[in-house]
Amino acid sequence: MNIHEYQAKEILRKYGVPTSTGLVVTKTEKINETIDKLNTEVYVVKAQIHAGGRGKAGGVKVVKSKEEAKKVAHDMFGINLVTHQTGPQGQKVNRLYIESGCDILKEYYFSIVFDRLASCITFIASTEGGVDIEEVAEKTPEKIVKFSVDPATGLQDFHMRGIAYELGFKDNQAKQMKEIVKSVYNAFVETDAAQIEINPLIVQTDGNLLALDAKITFDDNGLFKHPNITAMRDHDEEDPLETRAANAGLSYVKMDGNIGCMVNGAGLAMATMDIIKLYGASPANFLDVGGGADRERVKEALKIILSDKEVQGILVNIFGGIMRCDIIAEGIIAAAKDIGIKVPLVVRLAGTNVEKGKEILSNSGLEIIPAHDLADAANKIVEAIR
């Protein structure tokens, strides 16, 4: 789960991280009133969307008067902001964060992430912070340093010293950086975050460090422990189909292809998407119905897939362990009778009650294309949509 910048800063401040502060606007009629509350010489108007690259896309504006700030805010509110992370459709700006500007001496990059390959928490830092960190990673990766934290021992003083040293901080600034590292680590662990990113972390002209922008992504599996964080979720920033799927207990991610997939198990789902690509087509989604899906959940899964207008065919790939193939078959038939399936449907079943499931589908009278293995299923669905 992602949250907005102003929410991320609120969390970081609770853990002792110094951040820039401002006011949030959620309605156009509140823009002037909100800006009037800020007494500053420089105003920074920031679009609040769940995507990076706002600065380059015009979603962050720095102005030097109240009048300019009001005009920029009114112009920015409600637009579709297109960045390299939103895709061509962009993301509608429904919130603004308006801050007081500050003097910047130098910008740095600092983040903490759970490294799944190394099975540990990893700090990532660079002396080249700001909007071009992606370019730094591509062209000059040697300017980016990493420190891994052994989960058995946790954060140690040498991690904090090492990060401060690699960023070139000395004396009081090194002390400040060590405290920021410690605070960010505590926030990361205690909130079950998947990533915390501060970009840029700046040195002000007075020598103090400040988090000028912040992003936090949380592990969805840990949200049940944090109702206060769950309450920060902005459904307007999420795909409606993904939200609908989550409410039904389904794992769904929309993609750009034209073949809808319904599978049980994340690994099998990824293998299914891979083989669709191998046979020359593209998956329209990732959809894992889970191991304990019932007839209604299967029915809802198919409805969600068919809600995507780009879907030209559906591949159902089920390996029945806990999940019974006859339940899948009944769900498919129920969905077909309820909403009608007007695109080619290929079904591959294996495992528990597979013969019963195949019999149910065969006797349904529906135009269902059976497949005996995954390669056969992928080949048949790709051929069916051509």
Swiss-Prot record:
Pathway connected to this protein: Carbohydrate metabolism; tricarboxylic acid cycle; succinate from succinyl-CoA (ligase route): step 1/1
GO molecular function: ATP binding; magnesium ion binding; succinate-CoA ligase (ADP-forming) activity; succinate-CoA ligase (GDP-forming) activity
ATP-grasp domain location: 9-244
EC number: 6.2.1.5
Chain residues that bind Mg(2+): 199, 213
Entry's cofactor comment: Binds 1 Mg(2+) ion per subunit.
Alphabetical GO biological process terms: succinyl-CoA metabolic process; tricarboxylic acid cycle
PROSITE patterns hit by this protein: ATP_GRASP, SUCCINYL_COA_LIG_3
Protein biosynthesis keyword on record: no
Cofactor: Mg(2+)
A GO cellular component entry from the record: cytosol
Binding site for ATP: 46, 53-55, 99, 102, 107
Keyword Nucleotide-binding: yes
Subunit field text: Heterotetramer of two alpha and two beta subunits.
Family: Belongs to the succinate/malate CoA ligase beta subunit family.
NCBIfam families linked to this entry: PRK00696.1, sucCoAbeta
Name of the featured protein: Succinate--CoA ligase [ADP-forming] subunit beta
